[in-house]
Amino acid sequence: MWQSKGPPRVAFFSWLASLGKVLTTDNLCKRCIIVLDWCYMCKRCGESVDHLLLHCPVAFELWSLVFCLFGLHWVMPHKVIELFGRHRNIDFWRLVLHCLMWCIWSAINARYFKGFERSLLEIKSFFVHTLLVWSVALSHFSCFSLSVLLDHCNFVS
């Protein structure tokens, strides 16, 4: 997890998420902070780290995009920590995991703190754009091209 080539604050966020310590509504309730216990993304279930980043219908759509890009058929793990045990040796895959979780977290914070609700298409676009920008910044690719990113996704799988 710490060997990610992504931004350090994203690696820190992923570490907190893997420990279940991100301030979701269930964790805020444990600290006696009174909030509505519902997911701000799907507006249904109680919000836990695992629900928000893995099992929420909105997160599931984003994971489906990743699986489609990589040509993967994968059973979703129950806990965030289980994500980081898979594909350990592929830096780009780790970057994808960090980027997707960061984009979900950014979308939830935009809804919660700014009242700005991104559509699913906007969140998907934000994810692909962020992944491309991070990949170029980290020298995974020499050119800024979506087609190069998509080719690399197919190569990694």
Please state what every model-predicted region is.
Residues 29, 35-157:
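Family-specific functional microsites
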Residues 1-46, 155-157:
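Helix/loop segments that flank and initiate small ligand/metal-binding modules
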